[in-house]
């Protein structure tokens, strides 16, 4: 590999270059008395720019552009740094222009809404961060971009209502209440028609009481958990008659 460098007092200074065997530039880096300070670029053997970075006093700084390849395809990643830490809006975009991901940092920590997209450009998952932890709503999506599950977080733990949805109808499939990462309080499950299928109560992340319903809305059974199993208190047929 051929290269060219300039030295001052034994330290690399100015633009440093290396070359591919065909004579084209492979890397270009700017130094200031041995410390990277300026752009850092890398090229393919055909001259195509594959990486464009920036340093200030040896630390990552400013806008970075990376051309990446994977088994899913080629993409471009745009990222920003400040004082060596991720800071600002990041994005990944497929070669056809469709988004792969959007994210943001503040002082090296995750901040704001992060979104990951499928190959077709539909969202797969969106998560809200604050101070590097999940804080706020998180949504996962079906392949058509409609919500599959929505949850709420507080300081990295599930808190509040979590809902799951049916793919075909989009109606609510279940809803649970969480507190400090555990299921706590009332919960409900639904048929794909939207009718109530089951409701009950959770304690310490376990279901302890439930009522089941027929699709026609009639009560089917009432049960409570005892000794690790369910004890049926009442049972009814589909006409509402007690068995």
Walk through the language-model features, giving the residues of each.
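Glycine/tyrosine- and acidic-biased, solvent-exposed loop/turn segments at the edges of beta-strands
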Residues: 1-243
């Amino acid at each position: 590999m051929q290269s060219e460098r300039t030295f001052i007092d034994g330290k690399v200074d100015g633009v440093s270059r290396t070359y591919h065997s065909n004579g084209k530039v492979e890397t270009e880096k700017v130094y200031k008395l041995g410390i990277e300070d300026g752009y850092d670029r890398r090229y393919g053997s055909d001259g195509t720019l594959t990486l464009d970075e920036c340093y200030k006093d040896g630390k990552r700084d400013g806008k970075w552009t990376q051309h990446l390849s994977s088994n899913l395809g080629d993409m471009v990643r745009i990222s920003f740094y400040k004082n060596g830490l991720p800071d600002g809006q990041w994005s990944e975009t497929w070669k056809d222009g469709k988004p792969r991901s959007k994210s943001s940092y503040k002082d090296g920590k995750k901040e704001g809404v992060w979104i990951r997209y499928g190959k077709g450009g539909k969202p797969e998952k969106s998560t809200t961060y604050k101070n590097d932890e999940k804080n706020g709503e998180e949504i996962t999506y079906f392949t058509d971009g409609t919500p599959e599950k929505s949850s709420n977080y507080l300081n990295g733990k599930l808190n509040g209502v979590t809902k799951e949805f049916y793919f075909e109808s989009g109606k609510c499939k279940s809803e649970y209440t969480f507190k400090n990462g555990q299921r706590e309080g009332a919960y409900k499950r639904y048929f794909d028609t939207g009718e109530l299928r089951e409701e009950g109560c959770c304690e310490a992340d376990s279901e302890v009481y439930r009522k089941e319903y027929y699709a026609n809305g009639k009560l089917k059974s009432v049960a409570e958990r005892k000794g690790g199993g369910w004890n049926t208190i009442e049972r009814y047929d589909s006409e509402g008659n007690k068995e």
